[in-house]
């Protein structure tokens, strides 16, 4: 999988070997004149066209942008502002796309890490954020480690199947997903559900 991404990046970069970046490669980089949100809105095939197929659910471009706006409002309600880093441990789910775009609208950036717990905690601590995103299989032990080792006060939890039809998910994917639920799931006053998070932007 790693090699696939390397080949893809190399292809997008005009065949540049990302393991051997040279000075001229950096000098020739062009800074985009638009945001990712603007680029997608200019180039998407139509608002009613599905942008994401996610295990039995089609999510249109209109829904992507609508969800992006909702998340952006909720981020602002949590105090997120320009220059902030937003820690996210979400996997490849539709909500991550809208979260990424929403952070850009606010002027923030997404901090993604999938390392050891210790390394993840160090990265979140360095970001200085008082909230983070994770899936609902985050354990109580992991939650307490983040709360005690960082500035995080609130953790927004998202079920991986929030936007999918679970019956349309292949058994091997479902079994792999279930393997992530390894202990007592995080709960308590520091936890905000995804629905509660979205509701913050409605007030």
Show which residues each predicted segment covers.
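ANL superfamily adenylate-forming
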Residues: 142-203
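Short acidic/polar active-site loop segments enriched in Thr and Asp
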Residues: 81, 130, 153
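Conserved AMP-binding/adenylate-forming core of the ANL superfamily
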Residues: 31, 49-101, 118-121, 190-196
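Flexible, non-catalytic linker and terminal segments flanking ANL/adenylate-forming cores
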Residues: 1-34
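AMP-dependent adenylate-forming
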Residues: 13-20, 38-60, 185-186
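Conserved ATP-dependent adenylate/AMP-binding module captured primarily in the ANL superfamily
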Residues: 115-149
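Short hydrophobic alpha-helices that are characteristic scaffold elements of the AMP-binding
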Residues: 101-110, 125-126
